[in-house]
Amino acid sequence: MSQSAVSFQISPVSKTQDPLIQQKIDLKTKPPGALGQLESLALQIARVQATDSQQTDQPQNTVLKIVQPTMLVFAGDHGIAAEGVSIAPSEVTRQMVQNFAHGGAAINVFCRQVGFTLEVIDCGILTPVEGVEGIIDQRLGAGTGAIHLEPAMALETVDKGFAMARDLIERHHQAGCNLVAFGEMGIGNTSAAAAIMAAIMQLDVIDCVGRGTGINSETLERKLMLIELALLLHQSALTGPKSVLACLGGFEIVQMTGAMLAAAERKMLVVVDGFIATAAALVAVQIAPNVRDYLIFAHQSDEQGHKRMLEFLQAKPLLSLGLRLGEGTGAALALPLIQASVNFYNQMASFSDAGIEAVV
């Protein structure tokens, strides 16, 4: 299987009906712009759903819908974690995957609260969880290579991960889902995400690396050094976004990237969580720039490089809560705001409907 074996055909959203969509938003019973970011979000959702339905006129009559919102949590282990770059050992990845399956993690609580269906995907943790229902096996290996010593994986593995992710998204699309959100679990994956960020954005490592879920200063110095070694080791091989994933990524980051591309290909809305998920989005946009039209960025995390990545992607996140957990928690918490955008667009009266003089 070659590097180009899996490709995605992603249409840009149509903006030809923007004036009519914006007019519908502006004529609601409120001053123009008074609902702030919810208005720009409604415009984005209307663009995506108008593109999906291939409507050519009357977008003001379109009813926006969020159908079967689904949270996909991708899990994988990282070779670099053996060097102690995180507050927890790699075994915790497996333990947390079990916790997800048993419904006891933060992401389970939030998904139940807001109405997300949750699926957990084993992309390649060190030891698979057996005898527990609710974990989807999409294993690409038993943890990646240690990126400061060797490539994380082969290029062929990236394509295999993309193909698995496409099949996963296709299953949900066929079931009627039109919004997917992505979370992750993988001890050491902030190191991989920071390395990806540095490689793609051409930044110094110190501008990309943070404390993850709470490492001390000594561990942070080790993390910086190892990521710098990784970038130096693979410098000549970093020739494109897929090679960046192969050299520096994680199995869960690969499958998140592929799932974002596949969802956009199917004109589904994609809710991006925190630092790790945004690194996957960064790669996805390099592969297919049109994917950006479909991405909703849930929050700005407490990881110091996240703000830079969001700015690079010209993304304005919906929330800023100081989160640094991952799992898709920020994406889950953003769903009520996304639904609020849909609801005001569909249900608010216009000035003429309400018999109110328009506010200019």
From Swiss-Prot:
It is an enzyme of class 2 (transferase). Pathway: Nucleoside biosynthesis; alpha-ribazole biosynthesis; alpha-ribazole from 5,6-dimethylbenzimidazole: step 1/2. The active site is at E327. Gene3D superfamilies: 1.10.1610.10, 3.40.50.10210. InterPro entries: Nict_dMeBzImd_PRibTrfase, Nict_dMeBzImd_PRibTrfase_bact, Nict_dMeBzImd_PRibTrfase_N, Nict_dMeBzImd_PRibTrfase_sf. Catalyzes the synthesis of alpha-ribazole-5'-phosphate from nicotinate mononucleotide (NAMN) and 5,6-dimethylbenzimidazole (DMB). This is Nicotinate-nucleotide--dimethylbenzimidazole phosphoribosyltransferase. It comes from Shewanella baltica (strain OS155 / ATCC BAA-1091). The lineage of its organism: Bacteria, Pseudomonadati, Pseudomonadota, Gammaproteobacteria, Alteromonadales.
